[in-house]
Amino acid sequence: MGDFSTTVEKILVQYKVHILVFLLAFFIAITFAHPSILLTDEWITVNQLSQLHDGHQVIFNEGKYGYFENGTASAYFIKKDNYLAYPLFLPLISLPAYWLIDIWGDHFIFFMVYLWTFLLIAIVLVVNGFFPEYSSIGKWRWTTGLIVMSFVLFLSNLYFYRPFTITGKDSYPEFMAIAFTNIVLFAVLAVMVYEILRTIFKDSPYTIFGTILCITSSSYLFWTSFCKDHVLVAFLFTAIVLFAVKFLLTTNDWYLPGVFILTGLLAWARPELALFVFAFLCIFVLYSYVIMKSRFTPFSRAKLLVTAPLFTVIGAIPFCINNYLFTGNFFVPAWVLWKTNSASVGNVLSISTPVQPVSSDTLGSLLHLFLSTINIKPATFLSDVFGVLLNPQSGSMGVLPLVPLFMVTFLVLPVWWIYRHMEFSPEERRVLMAMILLSLSVFIAYIRGITGMNASLGIAPDMRYLSPIYLPWTIIGLVVVGKLPSIINNLKIIMKWIITTWIIIIPLSLVAMSAYYPFPESTVLLFRPLNNIISLGILIILMLFAICLINYHLFKKTEIPALLLFALLCAAPFIWQIDMTFLVRFYGTGLGGYSFWIPVMLKTFGFIF
C-alpha cells in the first residue's frame, strides 16, 4: 500500500502542471458552455448521433433534425438527398457522453453543477499542494477565499437550478453529448499544448505563458458549445504537432510513426486536410534526414525514417471502415454520396457498389470530384487571400487577428534582425521549419476554396476550416518573441496585465454589446460589427506596440508602454471568444439548443442581455 501511494505521489508531482492545465481548461469550458447549433451542417452530426444511440442506420436522415413538423425535409436535406454523409468520428466518441446523459436524465445539469464545483475545488487544492508560492497575494491567501467562493457559488447554483429536458419537443440531448465531448477534447488539447511548449522551452514560466496564449489565441473555446468537428480536428492536429516536436527534440524515433498514425486518424475526421498534412510530413521526413544525418546512421536506423509514412495506413483503418459503410468501397469517402447524382461524376460511385480494389476508374473519379471542389478565381486570388487573412468579405474574423503573436513576428523580426541579428538555436530552427510545414499543409488544403471562404456567409464567425493553423502560427510567434529580453524579463507583469484586462474589459464589452450592438435582421450578418471592431483594435494596438518596442530597443525609451500594449494584444483574442459566445447565445442559436449550463452563468447572461 505504501509503494502504491508513493507511486501515485510521484506521478502527481511529475505531472502537477499538466493536471492543473487540464482542470483549468475543463472548468473554463464548462463555465461558458451552452450546447447549441449554429450552422445547418450540424444537423448531420446530431442526427448521426441520435440514430447511433437508438441503434438505427446512419446513412439516411430519419427526420429528428432538419425536418419540419409535418415530416417534410428542409431545403438543406433536399439538397443533400437526405444523406448523412459526414464521418462518424465525432458521433461515435460522443456516445459515452450520451450514455451519461441517459443516466442523469433531465437532471444532467445537476451533475454538471457538481462537476463544475469539484473542478474549482480541485484547482485550489492543486495550487495549495504543489504551488504554495502562488497561493497568496501579499499576505492574503486567495485560495482560501476561492474555496469559500466555490461553496457560495454552489449554493447559488442550487438556488437558481432548473433542469434541461432531454425528452419531448424542445429537447436536444445530442447537443449536450457533443458539447461535453468537445469540452473533454478541449481540456486534453490544452494539456498537449503545454507538453509541446515544455518540450520546446523546457520547464519555464514562458511555457505557462505560451500555453495560455496558444489556447486563448484561437476559436477553440468558442466551438466547444457547438456540434461541428472543429475541436476534434484541432485536437488531432495538436497531437500531430506534439509528436512531431517530440521526434525533433527527443531521442525517441518512434514518435515519427506516431505522427503518421495520427495523420491517418485525421483522415477519418477531415480527409482533405489529412491528405496535405501527409504530403508535408513526407517533406518533413526528408528535412529531418538532411539536418540530422548523424542520428540516422548507420542505415539500419534510417529504416524507420523511410517506413514511417506507411504507418498512416494503420491510423486510416477507421476511415476506410467508415467509407465502406457508406459507399461500399474502402477508398471512397462518404461525402461522395452528395455528388453521385451530378453530371460530372455520373454513376461511377454509388452506395450499392460492391467492394472493389482501387482502380484507375476509382482514382480518376475521386480526382474529378476533388477538382470539382476547387473555387479559385485568378483575378481575385490576392484579394481573397488578403480577405481570409485579415478582413473577409463575409464579415467573419480573419485568421491573423486571432494570432497576434504571429503578426508581431512579421513586424518585429525584420527590424530586430537588422539591428541586433536575432540568433536561433538548431533546435529552434527545426521547430520553426516543422511549424511552417504544418501551417502550409492547412493553408494549401483549403486554398482550393479561397474565393468561397472569403465570401461565404457560412464560414463564420471565424475562418473555421483554417482553425488548426492557429497553433503552429502562435508557436512560431512564441519562438521569435522569446528572443526579446523586454518580454522574457517581464512575463509576470505582462500576465498580470493580461488577466486584469480580461477582468475589466470582458464585463464592460458585454454590457456595451447589450446596449449598443447593432443587431441585424439576418443572423448571417450578426458577426460583422464585433469582428470589425476587434480586428481594427488589434491592428491599431499592434502598430503602436511595434513603435513603442522600437523606441525602447533603439532609442532607450521606457519599456512600460510596449509591455502594456503587448498585454492588450495578447488579451484581445480571448475577449473576442467570450464576446462572441454571449452574442451567439443571445441572437444566433435559432436552430435549437440550450442556454448556459451553469445556473449562475445563465443568470449573469439574463442580467446583462
Tell me what each language-model feature is.
Residues 164, 493-609:
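Transmembrane helical bundles and short interhelical boundary loops of multi-pass, membrane-embedded
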Residues 128-169, 188-216, 235, 249-258:
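Transmembrane-helix signature of polytopic, membrane-embedded enzymes
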Residues 38-40, 219-233, 269-272:
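Short acidic/glycine- and proline-prone juxtamembrane loop motifs at membrane-interface regions
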Residues 273, 279, 283-290, 303-413, ...:
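Membrane-lumen/periplasm interface segments of specific transmembrane helices
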Residues 188-196, 233-250, 258-263, 279, ...:
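Specific aromatic-rich, kink-prone transmembrane helix
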Residues 121-134, 290-292, 386-440, 473-485, ...:
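Hydrophobic, aromatic-rich transmembrane alpha-helices
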Residues 210-215, 221, 243-244, 255-271, ...:
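Membrane-interface alpha helices of multi-pass inner-membrane proteins
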